[in-house]
From Swiss-Prot:
Site (Central gate) residue list: F387, V391
Basic and acidic residues bias locations: 111-151
Name recorded for this polypeptide: Cyclic nucleotide-gated channel alpha-1
InterPro entries: CLZ_dom, CNG_cation_channel, cNMP-bd_CS, cNMP-bd_dom, cNMP-bd_dom_sf, Ion_trans_dom, RmlC-like_jellyroll
Membrane side Extracellular: residue ranges: 186-195, 252-264, 316-342
Glycosylated residue positions: N327
Database matches in SMART domains: cNMP
Catalytic activities: Ca(2+)(in) = Ca(2+)(out); Na(+)(in) = Na(+)(out); K(+)(in) = K(+)(out); NH4(+)(in) = NH4(+)(out)
Pfam families reported in the protein's UniProt record: CLZ (PF16526), cNMP_binding (PF00027), Ion_trans (PF00520)
Matches recorded under Gene3D superfamilies: 1.10.287.70, 1.20.5.170, Helix hairpin bin (1.10.287.630), Jelly Rolls (2.60.120.10)
Transmembrane segments: 164-185, 196-215, 242-251, 265-283, 292-315, 343-373, 374-399
Positions of the UniProt region annotated as C-linker: 403-479
Binding site for 3',5'-cyclic AMP: R559, T560
Length: 690
């Protein structure tokens, strides 16, 4: 007989009633598969449960023996150790906090009667605390703003005028050092006689060098299209460049060596020459800014040549001093001679010798010593390079300056040959040549589209707006149009020049363009071409109604007057096709322009109202149908061409496949035969083995 132990609630004598339900709930949750730890609210129950376990272990064992079936542990027994472990962990932390919690409870009990009085004062205290917090936040924000204001740094835009002006300031001391340091080192009198001035200029240039390094740390640069203004980034960017190392070397205080060697050694300041890149940068920016770049390039080249000749003259004088003045015919003459003892004569003679040598003219005394020969050979090589540079650069500059004239002259020559070949009258030839002369003298030979085609669309539109928009707004029908349409039309305006006596349009001509007078005078003349009715001047326009092709116009699409140029006239032309192309994107503007055109025709009595209100014109429908037919024909031809290409490609592919088959067939046959042969050979061997 198996004994079945039935545990009742009375078996757990030492377990308080408060703990039982909570523990049972947690155990049932764990049986159902819920993996959750006990919350902080269950810490007390866990500790009480642990105490009951320690006091009555028999009850714990009897509780565990409560199974669903005999001989097998229940799910409660499986999960209970984990639950008890969790209870122990929580209990250990709770035991440490028990004395503190007891003290807090005592304080709370004591402070309960006081809290009733303080609850009344709580709103006032809360308000005061909130006000104090707001004040602190405002003070912190004010401090942050002040700190941000302090951190804000004035950044120089490298493309602005301030940076360009500073480049000019730093170029002056650089050029001073490059010209005077070598001269003072070679000509002792120049250094000793004007020592005070040189020292003042030297240290002033050093101050400018230091300021230039500071300016470099405040010069912005573009990062993702935006100018960087953070001080730390600017400094790090400058330090990471190779120029920073050169700048540091150029401001090393080598003047301290004056204490050891004396004031007659200005060559100790040669490290100041390392700042030459700033001079090159200034010249480069000036070349892009000036309106006369070719002249600036020539003058810049001449300056470089003069500096090279100056340095060569100083080196020649120093070599003569090292060998001895007057020791041979090649060196500088004896300085004891009054004619050659002056400082001005020393420099001029050396400069003259250097110029003759570097320009390969010669006519100088021949060298005597080996060192003199080496120096003259080096000078001749440098002179050849300088001469080639001069000829090449000046030749290219002159060709660039005359490129426009040469191209224009080529056009005139081609037209002259054509008129001579076609036997054009002499009067017509004179008119054509005068027209070309007018274009050249008034600098109207530039093709605007050719010049502006390299610019982005937005920049090109802005230039066209600045040049033509005011002129286009003078036209009545375009006065109230939206800005987008005006920009489209401005880009389509074409400049035209007419010579005296040229007809812009004649009565009865089909109107395909409208004209706006930019400069010059036009006359509305009779059929005889002499009688003038009206003179049109700058800002006038005509032909705007004809390009709208308004239905019901009695004049149709033809010109109603003869307009002739009195002198040379500059006009802007807007074609009908360009206008209609622009109006396709602006249908509302098209309707508004047609209404304005109808009002103008009604005022002049040139509008047939019945036809205008008759609805759509069948001619327009016919035009649309013809356009559709032409587009369909175009598509058919394209489809036929594509189909023919497809068929030809198929034929070529088939031919290639047949060639490949012919090539591979013998190879495949040989391989199959080899396989069959190997199979027959292996058969008898297998049988013998068996």
């Amino acid at each position: 007989m198996k004994k079945v132990i039935i545990n009742t609630w009375h078996s757990f004598v030492n377990i308080p009633n408060v703990v039982g339900p909570d523990v049972e709930k947690e155990i049932t949750r764990m049986e159902n598969g819920a993996c959750s730890s006990f919350s902080g609210d269950d810490d007390d129950s866990a500790s009480m449960f642990e105490e009951s376990e320690t006091e009555n272990p028999h009850a714990r064992d009897s509780f565990r023996s409560n199974t669903h079936g005999s001989g097998q542990p229940s799910q409660r027994e499986q999960y209970l150790p984990g639950a008890i472990a969790l209870f122990n962990v929580n209990n250990s932390s709770n035991k440490e906090q028990e004395p503190k919690e007891k003290k807090k409870k005592k304080k709370e009990k004591k402070s309960k009667p006081d809290d009733k009085n303080e609850n009344k004062k709580d709103p006032e205290k809360k308000k005061k605390k909130e006000k104090d917090k707001d004040k602190k936040k405002k003070e912190e924000k004010g401090k942050d703003k002040k700190e941000e204001e302090k951190k804000e740094v004035v950044v120089i835009d490298p493309s602005g005028n301030t940076y360009y002006n500073w480049l000019f300031c730093i170029t002056l001391p650089v050029m001073y050092n490059w010209t005077m340091i070598i001269a003072r080192a070679c000509f002792d009198e120049l250094q000793s006689d004007y020592l005070e001035y040189w020292l003042a200029f030297d240290y002033l240039s050093d101050v400018v060098y230091l300021l230039d390094m500071f300016v470099r740390t405040r010069t912005g640069y573009l990062e993702q299209g935006l100018l960087v203004k953070e001080e730390r980034k600017l400094i790090d960017k400058y330090k990471s460049t190779f120029q920073f190392k050169l700048d540091v070397l150029s401001v090393i205080p080598t003047d301290l060596l004056y204490i050891k060697f004396g004031w007659n050694y200005p060559e100790i300041r040669l490290n100041r020459l390392l700042r030459i890149s700033r001079m090159f940068e200034f010249f480069q920016r000036t070349e892009t800014r000036t309106n006369y770049p070719n002249i600036f390039r020539i003058s810049n080249l001449v300056m470089y040549i003069i500096i090279i000749i100056h340095w060569n003259a100083c080196v020649y004088f120093s070599i003569s001093k090292a060998i001895g003045f007057g020791n041979d015919t090649w060196v500088y003459p004896d300085v004891n001679d009054p004619d050659f003892g002056r400082l001005a004569r020393k420099y001029v003679y050396s400069l003259y010798w250097s110029t003759l040598t570097l320009t390969t003219i010669g006519e100088t005394p021949p060298p005597v010593r080996d060192s003199e020969y080496f120096f003259v050979v080096a000078d001749f090589l440098i002179g050849v390079l300088i001469f080639a540079t001069i000829v090449g650069n000046i030749g290219s500059m002159i060709s660039n300056m005359n490129a426009a004239r040469a191209e224009f002259q080529a056009r005139i020559d081609a037209i002259k040959q054509y008129m001579h070949f076609r036997n054009v009258s002499k009067d017509m030839e004179k008119r054509v040549i005068k027209w070309f002369d007018y274009l050249w003298t008034n600098k109207k030979t530039v093709d605007e589209r050719e010049v502006l085609k390299y610019l982005p669309d937005k920049l090109r539109a802005e230039i066209a707006i600045n040049v033509h928009l005011d002129t286009l707004k003078k036209v009545r029908i375009f006065a109230d149009c939206e800005a987008g349409l005006l920009v489209e039309l401005v880009l389509k305006l074409q400049p035209q020049v007419y010579s005296p006596g040229d007809y812009i349009c004649k009565k009865g001509d089909i109107g395909r363009e409208m004209y706006i007078i930019k400069e010059g005078k036009l006359a509305v003349v009779a059929d005889d071409g002499i009688t003038q009715f009206v003179v049109l001047s700058d800002g006038s326009y005509f032909g705007e109604i004809s390009i709208l092709n308004i239905k019901g116009s009695k004049a149709g699409n033809r010109r109603t007057a003869n307009i002739k140029s009195i002198g040379y006239s500059d006009l802007f032309c807007l074609s009908k096709d360009d206008l209609m192309e622009a109006l396709t994107e602006y249908p509302d503007a098209k309707g508004m322009l047609e209404e304005k055109g109808k009002q103008i025709l009604m005022k002049d009595g040139l509008l047939d109202i019945n036809i205008a209100n008759a609805g759509s014109d069948p001619k327009d429908l016919e035009e649309k149908v013809t356009r559709m037919e032409s587009s369909v024909d175009l598509l058919q031809t394209r489809f036929a061409r594509i189909l023919a290409e497809y068929e030809s490609m198929q034929q070529k592919l088939k031919q290639r496949l047949t060639k490949v088959e012919k090539f591979l067939k013998p190879l495949i046959d040989t391989e199959f035969s080899a396989i069959e042969g190997s199979g027959t050979e292996s058969g008898p061997t297998d049988s013998t083995q068996d």
